Amino acid sequence: MREYKVVVLGSGGVGKSALTVQFVTGTFIEKYDPTIEDFYRKEIEVDSSPSVLEILDTAGTEQFASMRDLYIKNGQGFILVYSLVNQQSFQDIKPMRDQIIRVKRYEKVPVILVGNKVDLESEREVSSSEGRALAEEWGCPFMETSAKSKTMVDELFAEIVRQMNYAAQPDKDDPCCSACNIQ
């Protein structure tokens, strides 16, 4: 069974913990309690292949930003979350993706861009097209979720597993990876 380390990143209050807890336990956290860092483990079967996810729910506040490099270094897949009802959180997500590329020294890191709180449609500040355009620019999947209504939560974690499974395959076009069996 494959084990993957998934890191959930985003500004404070965007719903990182709510998404993670909804996926792991099936419950919604009503009260906002800023996270420093929390680890969760969950088995998941995607495309008939079982995996264990070790999910790191990170702090969104700037005072813990210095810890991000370490999280990123150890992560294999990244869920970048912003709130659909907070334009600033959408702007804040861009440097986080840049930080992933800088730390990993690789452009094709498994990343999913997530607009959360789709249940608050009437308060929306970030359009779907803005999210899609950014995901297209980054070459990654884009999803809109709601931890509260459990919209696309399981699909989100299944998709990051697919992205990590794909990234774990040797690149047939890369002479380095096809010349040897190192994975």
UniProtKB/Swiss-Prot annotation:
<dbReference type="Pfam" id="PF00071">
    <property type="entry name" value="Ras"/>
</dbReference>
<dbReference type="GO" id="GO:0019003">
    <property type="term" value="F:GDP binding"/>
</dbReference>
<dbReference type="GO" id="GO:0030336">
    <property type="term" value="P:negative regulation of cell migration"/>
</dbReference>
<dbReference type="GO" id="GO:0048814">
    <property type="term" value="P:regulation of dendrite morphogenesis"/>
</dbReference>
<feature type="lipid moiety-binding region" description="S-farnesyl cysteine">
    <location>
        <position position="180"/>
    </location>
</feature>
<dbReference type="GO" id="GO:0046328">
    <property type="term" value="P:regulation of JNK cascade"/>
</dbReference>
<keyword id="KW-0449">Lipoprotein</keyword>
<feature type="propeptide" description="Removed in mature form">
    <location>
        <begin position="181"/>
        <end position="183"/>
    </location>
</feature>
<feature type="binding site">
    <location>
        <begin position="116"/>
        <end position="119"/>
    </location>
    <ligand>
        <name>GTP</name>
    </ligand>
</feature>
<dbReference type="InterPro" id="IPR027417">
    <property type="entry name" value="P-loop_NTPase"/>
</dbReference>
<dbReference type="GO" id="GO:0051963">
    <property type="term" value="P:regulation of synapse assembly"/>
</dbReference>
<feature type="short sequence motif" description="Effector region">
    <location>
        <begin position="32"/>
        <end position="40"/>
    </location>
</feature>
<dbReference type="GO" id="GO:0030036">
    <property type="term" value="P:actin cytoskeleton organization"/>
</dbReference>
<keyword id="KW-0378">Hydrolase</keyword>
<dbReference type="InterPro" id="IPR020849">
    <property type="entry name" value="Small_GTPase_Ras-type"/>
</dbReference>
<dbReference type="GO" id="GO:0097060">
    <property type="term" value="C:synaptic membrane"/>
</dbReference>
<keyword id="KW-0636">Prenylation</keyword>
<keyword id="KW-0458">Lysosome</keyword>
<keyword id="KW-0967">Endosome</keyword>
<keyword id="KW-0564">Palmitate</keyword>
<feature type="binding site">
    <location>
        <begin position="57"/>
        <end position="61"/>
    </location>
    <ligand>
        <name>GTP</name>
    </ligand>
</feature>
<protein>
    <recommendedName>
        <fullName>Ras-related protein Rap-2a</fullName>
        <ecNumber>3.6.5.2</ecNumber>
    </recommendedName>
</protein>
<dbReference type="GO" id="GO:0032486">
    <property type="term" value="P:Rap protein signal transduction"/>
</dbReference>
<feature type="modified residue" description="Cysteine methyl ester">
    <location>
        <position position="180"/>
    </location>
</feature>
<dbReference type="GO" id="GO:0001934">
    <property type="term" value="P:positive regulation of protein phosphorylation"/>
</dbReference>
<dbReference type="GO" id="GO:0005886">
    <property type="term" value="C:plasma membrane"/>
</dbReference>
<keyword id="KW-0832">Ubl conjugation</keyword>
<keyword id="KW-0342">GTP-binding</keyword>
<dbReference type="GO" id="GO:0071466">
    <property type="term" value="P:cellular response to xenobiotic stimulus"/>
</dbReference>
<dbReference type="InterPro" id="IPR005225">
    <property type="entry name" value="Small_GTP-bd"/>
</dbReference>
<dbReference type="InterPro" id="IPR001806">
    <property type="entry name" value="Small_GTPase"/>
</dbReference>
<dbReference type="GO" id="GO:0003925">
    <property type="term" value="F:G protein activity"/>
</dbReference>
<keyword id="KW-0488">Methylation</keyword>
<keyword id="KW-0547">Nucleotide-binding</keyword>
<feature type="lipid moiety-binding region" description="S-palmitoyl cysteine">
    <location>
        <position position="176"/>
    </location>
</feature>
<keyword id="KW-0333">Golgi apparatus</keyword>
<feature type="lipid moiety-binding region" description="S-palmitoyl cysteine">
    <location>
        <position position="177"/>
    </location>
</feature>
<dbReference type="GO" id="GO:0008104">
    <property type="term" value="P:protein localization"/>
</dbReference>
<feature type="glycosylation site" description="(Microbial infection) O-linked (Glc) threonine; by C.difficile toxin TcdA, and by P.sordellii toxin TcsL">
    <location>
        <position position="35"/>
    </location>
</feature>
<comment type="similarity">
    <text>Belongs to the small GTPase superfamily. Ras family.</text>
</comment>
<dbReference type="GO" id="GO:0098685">
    <property type="term" value="C:Schaffer collateral - CA1 synapse"/>
</dbReference>
<dbReference type="GO" id="GO:0055037">
    <property type="term" value="C:recycling endosome"/>
</dbReference>
